[in-house]
Amino acid sequence: MKIGGKLLERKTGGRSRYWQVFWLCFAVAAALFLPHCIIDGLNGDFFHYAGDFNDQQISFYSYANNFVKQGGGFSWATDLGSGFVNSYSFYLCGSPFFWLTLLLPYRWTPWAMVPMLCLKFAVAGGGAYLWMRRWVKDERWSMVGACLYAFSGFTVYNVFFNHFLDVVALFPYMLKALDDAVLDRRHGAFPFWVAVNLLNNYFFFAGQAVFLIIYFVCMVAGGRYKLNLRLFGALAFQTVLGCCMGCALLVPAALSLVQNPRTIDPFNGYGYLVYGSAQQYLAIFYSAFLMPDAPYLKDLFQEGILKHTSMTVYLPVVGIAGGLVFCRVRRRHPFARIMKVCLICAFVPVLNSMFYALNSSYYARWYYMPVLVLCAATAMTLQKANLCETEYRRALGLVALCTLSSIAFALVPNEKDGTTTIGVVEEPLRYWGILLVSMLGVGLFWLLLHYRRQLAARFPAAVLAVVLGFSFVYGQVHLSITKYGQWYHDADYVQQTRREAPELNAVLPDDVFYRLDAYDSYNNLGLWLDKSCIQFFNSTVAPSILEFYPTVGVKRDVNSKPEASLYALRGLLSVRYTLVPKEKVEDWEKEKLEGWNLVSSTTSYLIYENENWVPMGFTYDSYITEENFETVSDTNAGNVLMKALLLTDEQVERYGQMMQNLTDDEKNNISYEDYVQDCTARRESAVTSFTATRTGFTAQADLEAENLVLFSVPYDDGFTATVNGVPAEVEKVDNGLMAVAAPAGHSEIVFTYHTAGLRQSVAVSAGAIVVYAVWVAVLHRKKRREESSVG
C-alpha cells in the first residue's frame, strides 16, 4: 500500500502521471504473462496461447516481418496467392505495434509477441488516463479508471486476437483529441489520431466513427460541447483531413471487401430487431457480471452466437456498479446517455451491427468504447465520498445479486436423452470457478467500501492496488482456461511450425513451383515455409478464393480446408506434396487415397508426393459453359475442371473456337482413372517453365495452337499480363482463377501485380500529410503571435 500511496500522493493539478500509469500497466501485464512464458520456456518454446493467437497472430507477424523487408506486393504463401496489403491490412499492415517489430530480425518475432502485448496494455492505460483526467477531478481516480480500462474483461479476452488490442490501445487518444479540439480549441492532434486509428484498422475504425457520432451528439445534447457553425466546420475539416491522411490502405481494402461475401451479409425480417435465440440476450446481460470465459468455449449458454465474439464488459473488482451509480445520480450527464444508448445498441441486432457496416454476423467487438466511458463514470463517482457511503452499497448489492443469479443455470433440472441432470452449464467446474473469481472481486470491493473511512486519503491507492492485484488474479484464471484448455492440442505447435520449417524446406525441392497440402496439421504451415499451401486460415484473402472454393465443394468462410476426399482439386491446384504429422498417419491411411507415395520424412512429418501432380500453367482441349457446369455436383466439380475450362458465355464467343464444348458423356466420366488420364493430358499441355515472383509470375509456353493458358492463381484486378511483350487480357475463369490467351509457338507470359487502388490511396494520404503539416505550422505560428501579443 505504501508504494500505491507514494504513486498517488499528489491530487488534482500538477504534472501528468501518464508514465506512472504506463509503467504500472506494463508491469502488471508482464507479471500476467510471465508464468506462462516460463512454462513455455522450460519446454524450449516461445509463448504460445490458443486458437487465433497461435494460428494467425504469431505466424502472420513472423511472415509479414520477413515479407516487408524483402519487398513485393503479391504473397504466394497466402492461401492460393493473394495481395499482401489486402490480406494483412486488417491484421497488421497499418499497426504501429507491428512496425515496431520490424526493428527485430524476423526470426525473433515470436519472442516479441509478449513484449508487444505488454506495450499495448500500457499504451491503453496511458491513453485512457489522458482522456479521463479532464473529466475526473482527482488525478488519483483518473489512474484507477485508466487501469480499469487497461485490464477490463474486453482487453484480457482479446489477447486471443492480439491485433484487437491495437485498437483498444489507440482509441482513447483519438477521443481525448476530440475533447481537446472542441473544449480547448486545440486542433492539431485530432486529425493525427484519426489518421492513426484509420491506418491501424479500417474495419474497427468504422465502428469508432459510429461511436464518435454517438459521443458527439450526446455531448452536444448534454451541454458539454458548445457548438457553433465555425467550430463545426473546423471539426469537419479536421475529420476529413485525418481520414485522408490515414487512407493509405483504405481504398485497396475497400475494393477487396466489396467483393468479399463475408462483408455483404444483410439482415432480413425479424433479424433486424431480435436475435435468433433468447440465450443471446442472457449472454449479453451476464457479460457485465461474470469474468469472461475462453473465447472458443461455451459454458453458461449453448445457443446463440457466443464464441469468438468479444462479448464482455466486465471490469475487475468494481464491475458495473460505478455505471449504475452514475446513471442514477447523474442521469443527465452525457456519459450516462452514451452508456444508455450503447446498452440499447447491444440488445438490438441492427443497432449492434451499425458498428460493422450493418453486417448481420454477430460480434461485440465495439464494447471497448462504452467500456472506456464506463471506467470514467466509475472513477468520477468513486471520488465522491457520499456516493461510496450510500449509492455504491446499493449498486454493489445489485451487482452481487445479478452475479449470483447465474447459479440458477447450474441448478435447474435438465433432461437430455432420457437422463435428468442438474444444471444446463456445459462444464460445471469451470463455471463455478468463474463465478467464484467474479464474486471474489465483488467481495473485495465490498471490503474496500466498508473500510473506506479507515483508509481515508489512502482509499484511491487501496482501490488501485486491489484492482491491479485482482486483475492479475482473474487474468491468470482467464489465460489459464484459454491456454491450457488447448494444451494437449497445441503441445507440438512450436515443433511442428517454426522449429520444423527449416528441416522441411531442406527436404522439399525448390527447383520448380508447386503447392503443398497439410493433412490435419496446425493452421498456416505454409507461412512458416514461405510456400503456397491449400490449407489456410485468413479472413481477408483474395475475394476470388471465396468465390472459387464453394463451387468445388469447399466451404470457405475464415478457413480454406479442402477435404482430402476432393482429390481432383489437388491436380487442379498443382499440389505436389502432402505433409502428414506422424501422429495423424493412421487417419491419413484411413482416407485410402490413391496416387500418393511416401517419399521422405522429417522429425514430425511424413511427406507424400502426388503422382498426379500437374505443374502450374496448362491448357485444355475442351471448355464447359456455366449453364452446363451448374448441373455438376460440388464434389465432382474438381474432376470436371480437370477435363474442361469453365468459361462464361461471353468468353465462349471469344475463345470457343480454340477448344471443343465438353459433351455430357465426357462430363460424366469422373472416375479416378479418368482423373489420372486428365492429369496426364494437362501435364503434357503445361508451360515449359513457371517462376513465381514477389510481383506476380512469369511462364514460358510452347503451344501447338493458340489457346487459353490456365493458372490456378486467384483472379485479382491488380494483375496485368503481357504475352511476348504485348498487353493481354486477363480472363477470370473457373469461377475465380486466371487465364490468358497465348499464340501458337513459343510465348513468354508475364503477370505483374500492383495492389489495386494503393497508388491512389498513398497519393491522397501523402497530399493530406502535406496539407496537415502546413496547417499545423500555421496554427503554431498563430499561437506564437497570440502569446507574444499577450506578453
Where are each of the predicted segments found?
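Periplasmic/ER-lumenal interhelical loops and adjacent helix-loop junctions
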Residues: D52-A64, P96, F232, T239-V329, ...
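Active-site-proximal, structured, solvent-exposed surfaces of multi-pass membrane proteins
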Residues: R10-G14, F60, Q657-G791
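Active-site lumenal/periplasmic loops and adjacent helix-entry segments of GT-C-fold
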Residues: H36-P172, V196-F203, A283, A294-K307, ...
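Membrane-embedded helix bundles of polyisoprenyl
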Residues: A29, L117-R134, R140-G222, A234-A254, ...
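Hydrophobic alpha-helical membrane-insertion signals
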Residues: I3-G4, E9-N86, K483-N523, L527
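Extracytoplasmic/lumenal acceptor-recognition loop(s) of multi-pass membrane glycoenzymes
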Residues: N86, V466-D492, E503-V575, W613-Y675, ...
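Contiguous transmembrane helix-bundle modules in multi-pass membrane proteins
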Residues: R185, F204, F335-Q496, A744-G791
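Membrane-interface helix-loop-helix junctions at transmembrane boundaries of multi-pass membrane enzymes
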Residues: Y225-G233, G322-A346, L455
